[in-house]
């Protein structure tokens, strides 16, 4: 059995038009280690679980838990990436589907299908290996039935049967799989910005203030992992 976690990201101010959906697939036997990796990253930086940790707070010390510095947030994100999608520690299969045309309802559903179908390996033939449970972040503009239909289409294309229905959640630290999907989607935007939009990576930092050399070095390492890790795939742009 596998679990799939879905979240999306965008930043219309600094990366105009970019919209991405990330799907993270985890074998049930590896889920607990993924959860522990996310929990450890949050514990190590002292993050208060009353505040949501997500991609958009990584570069801002005034969002979320304000007692945690930008450097500590970057360390937490770096730790999550290293423990889940790096070549040495790959415990998930992740796909980021994206467009530069913005995130309308139609685009969102198409990106969900792309990301989910790409992150899942073909279903195994042993008993229970063809089952998948899917958890997705709530998005007000998307009707639950439309999301469910899109996901059923995606998992069926890889030979899976959906357990019950899609579980739609409100993001929080209590949903580490969805949290990880959000962080990876945002870091995917960071990677996109570095290749396509001159100066836009730095603009993602709060106030557009250039971070320390140490933070930039760590983010460079994160980008290298995302671009080289076999566990993460960037789906060709949706046009």
Identify the residue ranges that each predicted region occupies:
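Phosphate-ester processing/binding pockets and catalytic centers
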Residues: 1-239
